[in-house]
Design a protein with these regions (language model features):
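Short N-terminal strand-loop motif that marks the start
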Residues: 21-90, 154, 158-162, 166, ...
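NAD(P)H dinucleotide-binding glycine-rich loop of Rossmann-like/cofactor-binding domains
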Residues: 118-207
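Glycine-rich beta-strand-centered segment in the early N-terminal region that forms part
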Residues: 48-62, 75-125, 130, 153, ...
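Bacterial Sec-dependent N-terminal signal peptides
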Residues: 1-22
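C-terminal hydrophobic helical "lid"/dimerization subdomain
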Residues: 22-26, 325-378
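Glycine-rich cofactor phosphate-binding loops and adjacent beta1-alpha1 units
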Residues: 196-200, 228, 232-316, 377-378
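Mid-domain Rossmann-like dinucleotide-binding core that forms the NAD(H)/NADP(H) cofactor-binding site
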Residues: 109, 171-253
Length: 378
């Protein structure tokens, strides 16, 4: 009897301690795929409890990125299921850990493509957490090694628990329904444009005029560049002009490609399908630069012959992957201050609609970004 009483007291103390620390997890519901067929179904799971340096975000909006489609369909290799995609997240803070200073309850907050890193390697020390030498922890389809190897699940859900250092402050005056895509598509295009140092009058090209490309055009026009858009359809010609592009080239029309070699200081390729990068290399001026941020499926990955690099007037080709947290915050503040937002189509949070939206992304039948209203989640 005495032993049972002691055990009962110990259990009560442990339970009280666990409650005080917030142990027990955060019940979460959302939409997941359970295999690579792209069919979304309701899914309930538990996120880890809010830690001392973490916040809990009520998700208001989640963008659909083309890379979500690639992951869901295993275009880049085997994945683990069930999978809740979504790394373009905008919401409101509903809980803060006791050490949090960056946010308070009620603030808008966002999450992009990553939610953790080692924070001490050379890349992390230079605010390039996406290149963490121990591996950045992705917002979904990953393992959170700092929270009990919990599988990360993304933003097609009603909440997210994240370290305050990996959450982005969303200005109170932001058009919140349009913010989410900026946290992937926005930073993916902003970062190489910023790092190249585009200036007024530079002649630049944007290859691919979709979710990424239409944001790139807005950033470049704001900087005073002379922008040409390259795409495979006539359907977006008027949109490119409306956003400030001075020229639109349908690459399926050979006549429109004439006279473009050695014309551009910088070209940004956002193309997520198979194409010929050498065509764009040849369009660069002496010392011109081609930045590649679009990634096709593994079976459609383009190749660049070495001679196309060596023999072409000191032209440079480089890749760029999203941006660090500091640069992402800079991008968001700049975008909101300058009225740069994606053009979005808001859809309800139901499995059938999300599944249909994915197919439309594959078919190129979206202008320019689908955003899920997670407030409609039932």
């Amino acid at each position: 009897m005495k032993r049972n009483i002691i055990l009962a007291i110990m259990c009560t103390v442990c339970t009280m301690a666990a409650s005080a620390q917030g142990v027990g997890g955060v019940p979460t519901k959302g939409f997941a795929v359970f295999k690579n067929d792209g069919q979304f179904k309701p899914y309930a799971f538990t996120r880890h409890a809010v830690g001392d340096n973490e916040i809990q975000i009520e998700i208001l909006y989640a963008g659909i990125c083309h890379s979500d489609v690639h992951h869901v369909r295993e275009d880049w290799g085997p994945e683990k299921y069930p999978m809740v995609p979504g790394h373009e997240i905008a919401g409101r803070v509903v809980k803060v850990g006791r050490n949090v200073t960056k946010f308070k309850v009620g603030d808008y907050a966002g999450i992009g493509c990553m939610i953790g890193s080692c924070r001490h390697c050379e890349a992390c020390e230079h605010d390039l957490e996406q290149y963490c030498e121990e591996g950045a922890i992705m917002t979904y389809h990953d393992i959170d090694r700092y929270n009990g190897n919990e599988p990360t699940q993304g933003g097609y859900s009603d909440n997210y628990v994240v370290a305050e250092d990996f959450a982005i402050k969303i200005p109170a005056n932001a058009e919140i329904e349009k913010v989410a895509p900026l946290l992937c598509a926005g930073i993916t295009t902003y970062s190489p444009i910023r790092n190249v140092g585009i200036k007024k009058g530079d002649k630049v090209g944007v290859a691919g005029f979709g979710g990424l490309g239409h944001l790139a055009v807005q950033y470049l026009v704001k900087l005073g560049a002379d922008v040409t858009v390259f795409d495979v359809t006539e359907a977006k010609r008027a949109d490119a002009a409306r956003m400030g592009a001075t020229r639109y080239v349908n690459v399926n029309n050979s006549d429109e490609l004439q006279g473009l070699n050695k014309q551009y200081d910088f070209i940004l390729s956002t193309i997520p399908a198979k194409y010929d990068p050498v065509m764009y290399v040849k369009m660069l001026k002496l010392d011109g630069q081609l930045a590649i941020v679009g990634i096709p499926s593994a079976t459609n990955m383009p190749s660049i012959p070495v001679n196309a690099i060596v023999m072409n007037s000191n032209r440079k080709i480089f890749g760029s992957q999203i941006g660090g947290i500091k640069e992402t915050q800079e991008m968001l503040d700049y975008s909101v201050a300058n009225g740069i937002y994606p053009e979005v189509e808001i859809i309800p949070a139901d499995g059938k609609t999300i599944t249909e939206a994915y197919q439309k992304v594959v078919d190129g039948d979206v202008k320019f970004r689908y955003v899920i209203d997670m407030q409609t989640l039932k």
